[in-house]
Each structure stands twice: as C-alpha cells, then as structure tokens.
Amino acid sequence: MKMKMIVVISILLIVFSLSSKAMSLEDEQESVQREEDDLLGFSEEDLKAIKEHRAKNAGRFDPAV
C-alpha cells in the first residue's frame, strides 16, 4: 500500500513539474514575442490591429471596396 502511495505522489509531482515548466516556457515565449515587437517599433495598438486583421477570414475579392 505504501508503494502505491509513493508511486501516485511521484506521478503527481512529475505532472505538476511538467505543467509548471510548460507554463514558464509559454511566459518566456510571450516575453520574447513582446521584445521582438518592441524592436520593430510598432505600438501595442498597431500590433493589436495587425493581429485582428490577420485573424479575419479572407473573403471574396471585391474591387469596389
């Protein structure tokens, strides 16, 4: 019974460690992205507008627009 308890606790610690590592890598990636954006010289509003524009689906080409 003690062995099962040790195994379960070990597995939980490993899962927690991996999720913590993944979160820190995600934070680091966001930080690097912000630094790259800062180096480009775009303001936050410009970057937000660019990201929103990229997120829109490309519709049909309408020459009247």
UniProtKB/Swiss-Prot annotation:
It is found in: Secreted. Residues 1-24 form the signal peptide. Expressed by the venom gland. GO terms for cellular component: extracellular region. Residues 25-34, 59-65 form a propeptide. The keyword Signal applies. The modification Alanine amide is found at A58. The keyword Ribosomal protein does not apply. Helical wheel projections predict no hydrophobic face, suggesting a non-amphipathic peptide. Does not show antifungal activity. This is Peptide ToAcP.
